[in-house]
Each structure stands twice: as structure tokens, then as C-alpha cells.
Curated annotation (Swiss-Prot):
Positions that bind ATP: 613
Compartment(s) of residence: Cytoplasm
Cross-referenced HAMAP family: Ile_tRNA_synth_type1
Family in the record: Belongs to the class-I aminoacyl-tRNA synthetase family. IleS type 1 subfamily.
Task of the protein: Catalyzes the attachment of isoleucine to tRNA(Ile). As IleRS can inadvertently accommodate and process structurally similar amino acids such as valine, to avoid such errors it has two additional distinct tRNA(Ile)-dependent editing activities. One activity is designated as 'pretransfer' editing and involves the hydrolysis of activated Val-AMP. The other activity is designated 'posttransfer' editing and involves deacylation of mischarged Val-tRNA(Ile).
Record EC number: 6.1.1.5
Gene3D superfamilies, per database record: 1.10.730.20, HUPs, Ile-tRNA synthetase CP2 domain-like, Valyl/Leucyl/Isoleucyl-tRNA synthetase, editing domain
Subunit structure: Monomer.
Name this polypeptide is given: Isoleucine--tRNA ligase
């Protein structure tokens, strides 16, 4: 007889091999047809008591998505779905940042020389087309990753109504008195010919000069100091700015010496000056810094006067203690000179070259003007050093961290120009400053990880006023009018509203296309001929910082609550989007636009190195999807500590693939062994089933709590350990005998099946937010007792607790099992046995049912017969004797319980009677 035909072997149509790369696109297509998945999620939770809104930080509509984009969007979508399966109403409106330098630069490359002949309107139209093209490209690339969002109704910062909303936000800030136009040094990208905000600057190592220059004090100054001659020795790392020197700053709290050579240094730095060979160190006089205040020195380059001033910014950690001060080229310099009413000179044009200011202000001798006017500043350093002659006391080169433009990757400069600023320290918000209010809001915000609040807090504490103006073409205009005669900017509600309405209908292009008379109301008190336009555009960080107002507060989108539950981006956005949104939100609403902030790290190769094409270590999300499957990409993210940088490589993805197979095969085993289950009624669970259900209760609860706290790696670690060690490693293995060999309706078999069905149901619920594709697929092959009324994954829920804790203390059994298998390893190694079914276990206690104890140790039976003892061990004073089973092997179940060879054991004999009937 072929006994195999009599076994109740597992059966399921749920495939062992997932074929993810091949099959995922088909399922994703179904999810996105008529926005099926997202709309169903909305419909299923329309009566939910709680809601969760994740406001999407907009990527640039420029280029294809990379692995970092995939990390970001998958993490967002997983959190959205976590809240959905918790029973909450969710909203996820994706968006794109469509303005700004990255897009404009790409268009410039496409247009080449043709750009020079185009109007601003035409250039902006090319930018709009470029952005539209990449919105469509990126949207499809995100959908290829199975990311569920409101893809049919995204927000685009270049939409007409959006530009109007950004402009209205700007006007609100202006009306609060927080907007100011002034000439001030700002980061300037000469390569992009535009001002930059702090968030648009990245720091790299750069080699520069370190020079010490003697500025001779004039006769009056020497007389006042009671010396025949003296020279202020300044230190600088930017020789090219010396032509614009207006002052020399000293620290008011320090003492300064005049050496025997007549050189002035800070007392605290005299020793280092001696070491550099600048002086012998012999002191002629020592005075407090304030004794030098308002004395005048002579600039050796041009003979112009340079005033000695006090500056708290002057440090004693390097240099001479006297700082070269050019108010047009440094923020500290600017503020220090402002107190003394010193003129700001700016002899550098927008492309980083010296301009006619050199001639107009006499900043260089006339015979040098032709050589220097039009010369790029970074090519002037050596020439300046040569001109200094003997006044150059010391020169060396050093490498330091220097600001670079984030897009052109060229070093930036400080350049004083007229710019628009949002003021950080004016008490305009109910007597408080924007800085104070923003810091208060941060304390009310939940951060994941918690360290984020300190990081952004220190940035807000120390940041300067926000420069929001740019001198480019593609962006939202700072659409204000200026009085032609007085040059005063006009802040008028009627004008604001009229321009906003025009933008809403015609887009911000109207600012360039329309004449002034068409941009003001017909009966306006202002006359078009007396007005002129401000043509600067807004920093793109203002655009994105205003998105909460344009998306959540405008009513134009079904995007959820007016205040986002969460903002989620890379950790670099502490200085970017998180901060710009905080400042804009606090300025107009006196409230942060978010309740919580979650940050993730960046993607690196397996060695922790940044990915780059030149290194050949780039792994694209498309490659992962087509090679391994999106589900593997998702699991890689969820198994990683996303708060730090995430390493990715083929080796790592293969390891993740193994973990995925472990999950999939466990689900498959559970489905296959519950296929013929008719109901979930069981009189009483067997001890082993109570044990696994108790373990599952603890693990499922802990995993769920971890997932709800966005600690996905922790949740999966708990879950995978349970699946490997307890479920697959013990329970499923020891349950095979009763599942396959007991009769179909046997109580022991039914108990195991019900336990498995309950665990399978909860496991699918737990995995639904994280591995939605696999769960959706599994449901198609699951017993109705597991899937219930669910037509697909979006009908599942995590609202019910899995509560099957029978209070089992398994300490004794787990310890006994461990010691048992230590002995088994020895017996197998010595080739005494091949299988534990060749054994019986002899015990003297009666704590557990013998039949279940035999299953626990996977022996043929618990016996008290005098059989050959092969090994023994002890646990908690209870003795275990491993003996050689004396009965014959059952040809059906393979246990040594038969009285005769080739004869079924009593259990199998009874089962076979039922089969034959």
C-alpha cells in the first residue's frame, strides 16, 4: 500500500517562488487603475474617528528618481499604511518642487546660446515644460515601486493657483512686518549669478592663503599711542577682498601689544606670532583694545583709510587678533561696521569679477585698473600678494572647510547686494520674535529620533535673517511694486489681492508679461506711471516652505488635516524643508505646520561610501526592482535602522531576499496546512498549541507596538526571530506528525490547524502595511477563515488585539529541549542514530501529557520501559533518559510504535480504517 496517499499533506496554490520582478507590475497596475488602492483606502476609513496626514516634501521635478527617493517614498507610504491599518483615515498627496536653479540650469544646457535671444517668458515656458516632463517621468517611476498615493491629484509648485498661494503667503509675512529689503552680504554663487540661502550651501575642503599684512597707523594715531610708528597686523584668508577693506576689528575684551618693531598684535596671540617669525616678541606697550578704537590705519593697496573698530566676533583661536574687515564681503564685518556708520563697498559683480567700483572708489592705483577690472576674484589673489610687497609679513596655504554652491559645486563668496529678508529678531509676533516663536514650536513637536530637536534647534538659534530673494528667471516672483521716485516698496492689501488673483488665473508669468497698468485695479489710488516692478524671484525653499499653506490650508486638495501629522525627509532637511516650513508656518500662523518630524539617513554602498557614478557603486531603484523585486527593496528599508545611513549592495539585497523567503515560506506553510479547515471551533487547544499561541501573542504585540512607533527594524527583528526560532524552528516541525498523520477531524489536528489559522490571520494583518504586495497575493490563496470578508489587502485591519496568552511558563521545556538536542548532536555525530524518531524518552515526572511531550522532543514516545540508555541529562532536578526505541517503525508515520515490521502503529491503523471507509 502507498501510505503517502493516505497522508493529509499540505496543499496550497500560493507559490513558493515569488517571481517578484515579473509579477509585481501586474498587481501594481491593478492598484493604480482609476486610483483604485488610494480611493479604496479613503472610502474604507471615511467614518474613522482618527486621521493621519503625512505632508509630502516635494522632490525636484528634474532627473530620474534614485535609491534615496525610493527610500523616502517607501518609508512615507509604509507609515501612511500603518496608520490606515490601525483604522485611521489617511491622506498622502504627493508633490513636486517645480521652480528653481536645478531646473533652470538644465534648460540652459538644452538651449545653449539660444537662451540669450529669448525673453523671460520664453525661458520660463521652457522651464515649465522641463518640469512637467519630469513630473510625469518620476510619477511613473514611483508607481513602478508600488507606492500608493493620490497620484492623480499631486501638487505642483508651478501650478497657477499654487504660485498664487505662495505669493499670498509672502504677502501675509509682509503684513506682519517680518519682511525687509536691505543691502547686506549674503552667500553669492558667482557661477549661478544669484544669492543663496544657508540651505543651498554645502561645505567642502578648499585650499586658501593665510596672510598677515601690516597696515601702518597714520601720524595722528601714532601720536595718540605715544609711539613713533606702529602697524596693525591684520590676518585674512581672502586676499582678494583687501581692496574693499574699510576697517580693522579688535576684540574689545582683549589686551593688545605694540612690539619693539612697532607691530600690533593681541597679547593672547603674541607667542604664536613669535613662532611664525613675525616679531621677536619684545613688548613696547600693552593696551586695552578700546585704546585703539577709531584710530586710523592706511591700506597698503590703495592708501585709503581703515578705521580700527571693536568686534565681539574677533576670536583668539588664530590669526593676529586684528581682523581685516570688508563689510561688503562678510556678515560679521557688515554688522561690526554698521555700528560705526562705515560705508559698504562692493567692487565685485554678479559673475565674481572686479567691476568699475575699483575706479569709482579708488580701490586700486589707476595704472592697475585695466588689469583688475573684469578679472575674476579667485585669479587675483597672487597679484594682490605681489602688490603688498614688504607689507606682506607672512604668507602660507592651508586647507579648510569652505562654502560651495549646492548646484554649481563652485566656491561661493559673500557679496553685499540688495536682497529680501525674513527677519528673525523683530518682535512682531505678539511681542515675540520669529526666532523665539519658532524655538517654542519645536518644543511642541515630536521628533523621530528625539535628537532631531537639538539639531534643528541649534540651527534656528544661530541662523541669520532668511534671505529669500534670488536673481534668476524660474520661480515665483517677489511681486511688489516700488515707487519710482522714492524707491519705497508698497505693501498694500488691495494690490496684494489683485496680483494674487491674476496669478491664480494666468500664472506668475503675468508679472513679466503684463504691463503695470494691467497688474493694478482700475480705480487704484496708485498710478501705473509712478510704479516699477521688483523682479527678484523667491528662494525655492520659500516655495516648499509654503506648501502646507497651499496644500493643507487652501482647500484645493483633499490632503487631510490643516496641520500635518508628520513631515518625513532625510536628515539634511533640518536645515532645509523642516526649517523653512517652520519659519513660514510660525510667521503666518504662529504655529509649526507639523505635529511630528521623522528623519532618515542616506544610502551608501556596503562599505559606507557615498554612491557616485565615477566609483561605479550606484545601485538604482529600478535595478533593484527588476533584479530582486520591489518587495525586497521595501524589506531592505524596513530591516535597516533608517535613522542612520543605510548600506545597500547586491550582497545585502541577497541577504534580505533570504529573510523574505523565510517570511513567504512560513506564510505558505500556514496556508497549506489550513486549506481544509472548516471552522475555528476547538474544545481546547493542546498544550503545544497553547505554547505557540502564547509566544505569538507576546511577539505580535511587541512587533505591532514597534511598527506603531515606526521602529520597523525592531518589529521585524522580533517577528523574524519568532518565525525562525519558535514557529518554524520548533512548532511547525513538531506539528507535522499530527497534521499529516492524524485523521482529518482529529482533535489534535484541528487544534493545530486553528492555532495556525489564527496566527496566519494576524501575521498577514501585521505585514499588511509593510509587505502589502505579498499579503495581497497570499489572501488570494488563503482559506476564507483566514481572510474573512477581505477582498484584498486593503480590507485588512490591525485594530483587533491578538490575545491568546495562556500563561505558559516554558522555561523548563525550552531548557530541556536545548539539552536534549545537545545530546542528539553527539549521537548523530557518533552515527548512533540518524533521526530522533529512533528514540524514546524516559522520564519520572508527570507535568505534561506524554503524547505532547513526545512531539516536543520529536521522539517516538515517552516510555518507562527498561530500554538501552544512550544519554541522559537533568533539568531542575528532573532526570531525562534518552533510550533506544524498541518497537518497529510504522511505515506510515515513521514513528517506532508498531509491534511488527511493515505494520502501521495503532494510531495509523485507526486512521486507515476511516480512510478505507
Amino acid at each position: 500500500m502507498d501510505y503517502k496517499e493516505t497522508l493529509l499533506l499540505p496543499s496550497t496554490t500560493f507559490a513558493m517562488r515569488a517571481n517578484l520582478a515579473e509579477l509585481e507590475p501586474q498587481r501594481f497596475k491593478k492598484w493604480f487603475e482609476q486610483n483604485y488602492a488610494y480611493e479604496k483606502m479613503k472610502e474604507n476609513r471615511k467614518n474613522a474617528k482618527k486621521s493621519f496626514t503625512l505632508h509630502d516634501g516635494p522632490p525636484y521635478a528634474n532627473g530620474h528618481i534614485h535609491i534615496g527617493h525610493a527610500l523616502n517614498k517607501i518609508l512615507k507610504e509604509t507609515i501612511i499604511k500603518t496608520h490606515y491599518f490601525k483604522g485611521e483615515s489617511v491622506r498622502f498627496t504627493p508633490g513636486w518642487d517645480c521652480h528653481g536653479l536645478p531646473i533652470e540650469q538644465q534648460v540652459e544646457v538644452k538651449l545653449g546660446e539660444k537662451k540669450k535671444s529669448l525673453s523671460k517668458k520664453e525661458i520660463r515656458e521652457f522651464c515649465r515644460q522641463h518640469a512637467s516632463e519630469f513630473v510625469d517621468i518620476q510619477r511613473e517611476e514611483f508607481k513602478d515601486l508600488g507606492i500608493i498615493a493620490d497620484w492623480d491629484k499631486p501638487y505642483l509648485t508651478m501650478k497657477f493657483e499654487f504660485e498664487a498661494a505662495i505669493y499670498r503667503t509672502l504677502c501675509e509675512i509682509a503684513k506682519k512686518g517680518l519682511l525687509c529689503e536691505r543691502s547686506k552680504p549674503v552667500f553669492w554663487s558667482w557661477a549661478a549669478k544669484s544669492a543663496l540661502a544657508e540651505a543651498e550651501v554645502e561645505y567642502q575642503d578648499k585650499e586658501d592663503y593665510s596672510i598677515f599684512v601690516a597696515f601702518d597707523l597714520d601720524v595722528k594715531a601714532c601720536e595718540k599711542l605715544g609711539v613713533s610708528k606702529a602697524s596693525a597686523v591684520i590676518w585674512t584668508t581672502t586676499p582678494w577682498t583687501l581692496v574693499a577693506n574699510q576697517a580693522i576689528a579688535l576684540n574689545p575684551n582683549e589686551n593688545y601689544v605694540i612690539t619693539k618693531e612697532g607691530l600690533i598684535f593681541a597679547s593672547a596671540l603674541l607667542k604664536s606670532m613669535v613662532e611664525k617669525g613675525l616679531t621677536s616678541g619684545e613688548i613696547q606697550k600693552e593696551l586695552n583694545a578700546k585704546e585703539f578704537e577709531k584710530l586710523e590705519a592706511i591700506n597698503p593697496l590703495n592708501g585709503r583709510k581703515s578705521v580700527l573698530i571693536m568686534g565681539e566676533h574677533v576670536l583668539m583661536d588664530g590669526g593676529s587678533g586684528l581682523v581685516h574687515t570688508a563689510p561688503g564681503h562678510g556678515e560679521d564685518d557688515y554688522y561690526a561696521c554698521l555700528k560705526y556708520g562705515i560705508e559698504v563697498l562692493m567692487p565685485v559683480d554678479d559673475s565674481g569679477c572686479y567691476d568699475e567700483t575699483l575706479r569709482a572708489k579708488g580701490l586700486l592705483p589707476s595704472h592697475l585698473l585695466e588689469e583688475f577690472i573684469g578679472l575674476h576674484i579667485f585669479k587675483a589673489n597672487e597679484k594682490i600678494l605681489e602688490l603688498l610687497g614688504e607689507k606682506l609679513l607672512h604668507s602660507s596655504k592651508f586647507i579648510h572647510s569652505y562654502p560651495f554652491c549646492w548646484r554649481t559645486h563652485k566656491p561661493v563668496i559673500y557679496r553685499a547686494t540688495k536682497q529680501w529678508f525674513i527677519l528673525m529678531d523683530e518682535p512682531k509676533l505678539q511681542g515675540k520674535t520669529l526666532r523665539e516663536c519658532a524655538k517654542e514650536q519645536l518644543l511642541k513637536t515630536t521628533f523621530y529620533p528625539q535628537s532631531g530637536v537639538k539639531r534643528i534647534g541649534s540651527m534656528v538659534e544661530n541662523r541669520p535673517d532668511w534671505c529669500i530673494s534670488r536673481q534668476r528667471d524660474w520661480g515665483t516672483p517677489i511681486a511688489f511694486f516700488r515707487d519710482k521716485n522714492t524707491k519705497e516698496v508698497i505693501f498694500d492689501d488691495e494690490l496684494f489681492d489683485f496680483v494674487a488673483a491674476i496669478f491664480e488665473k494666468h500664472g506668475a508669468d503675468a508679472w513679466w508679461e503684463f504691463e503695470i497698468k494691467d497688474l493694478i485695479p482700475t480705480n487704484s489710488k496708485y498710478k501705473a506711471e509712478n510704479l516699477e516692478k521688483v523682479y527678484d524671484i523667491l528662494d525655492v525653499w520659500f516655495d516648499s516652505g509654503s506648501t502646507f499653506n497651499a496644500v493643507l490650508n487652501s482647500g484645493l486638495y483633499d490632503a487631510g488635516e490643516k496641520r500635518a501629522s508628520m513631515y518625513l525627509e532625510g536628515s539634511d532637511q533640518h536645515r532645509g524643508w523642516f526649517q523653512s516650513s517652520l519659519l513660514v508656518g510660525t510667521a503666518i500662523n504662529e504655529s509649526a505646520p507639523y505635529e511630528s518630524i521623522l528623519t532618515h539617513g542616506f544610502t551608501t554602498d556596503e562599505k559606507g561610501q557615498k554612491m557616485s557614478k565615477s566609483k561605479g557603486n550606484v545601485i538604482a531603484s529600478e535595478y533593484v526592482a527588476k533584479t530582486y523585486g520591489v518587495e525586497i527593496l521595501r524589506l531592505w528599508i524596513l530591516l535597516s535602522d533608517y535613522s542612520s545611513d543605510l548600506k545597500i549592495s547586491d550582497n545585502i539585497l541577497k541577504q534580505v531576499g533570504e529573510q523574505y523567503r523565510k517570511i513567504r515560506n512560513t506564510i505558505r506553510f500556514l496556508l497549506a496546512n489550513t486549506n481544509d479547515l472548516k471552522d475555528l471551533e476547538v474544545k481546547e487547544f493542546s498544550f503545544i498549541d497553547k505554547w505557540i499561541l502564547s509566544r505569538a501573542t507576546k511577539v505580535f504585540k511587541a512587533s505591532k507596538e514597534a511598527f506603531f512607533a515606526y521602529e520597523f527594524a525592531k518589529g521585524f527583528s522580533l517577528l523574524l526571530n519568532f518565525l525562525s526560532a519558535d514557529l518554524s524552528g520548533i512548532y511547525l516541525d513538531i506539528s507535522k506528525d499530527r497534521l499529516y498523520c492524524d485523521s482529518e477531524n482529529a482533535q489534535r489536528r484541528k487544534s493545530a490547524q486553528v492555532a495556525m489559522a489564527l496566527m496566519a490571520k494576524e501575521l498577514l494583518n501585521l505585514l499588511a502595511p509593510n509587505l502589502s504586495y505579498s499579503v495581497d497575493e497570499a489572501l488570494e490563496h488563503a482559506n476564507v477563515l483566514i481572510k474573512g470578508d477581505a477582498k484584498d489587502v486593503f480590507d485588512l485591519s490591525l485594530t483587533q488585539d491578538f490575545d491568546y496568552d495562556f500563561g505558559i511558563d516554558d522555561t523548563f521545556l525550552m531548557s530541556a529541549r536545548e539539552k536534549f538536542f545537545e545530546q542528539i548532536d553527539i549521537l548523530k555525530k557518533d552515527k548512533i542514530i540518524k533521526s530522533t524518531l529512533e528514540l524514546n524518552l524516559n522520564i519520572s515526572f508527570n507535568k505534561f501529557p506524554n503524547e505532547e511531550l513526545a512531539d516536543w522532543f520529536m521522539v517516538s514516545q515517552i516510555s518507562n520501559e527498561n530500554e538501552e540508555i544512550l544519554a541522559e541529562f537533568e533539568v531542575e532536578n528532573e532526570k531525562f533518559k534518552i533510550t533506544k526505541a524498541s518497537l518497529c517503525k510504522c511505515p506510515r508515520c515513521w514513528k517506532l510504535q508498531s509491534k511488527n515490521e511493515e505494520t502501521p502503529c495503532l494510531r495509523c491503523e485507526e486512521v486507515l480504517k476511516g480512510v478505507q471507509c
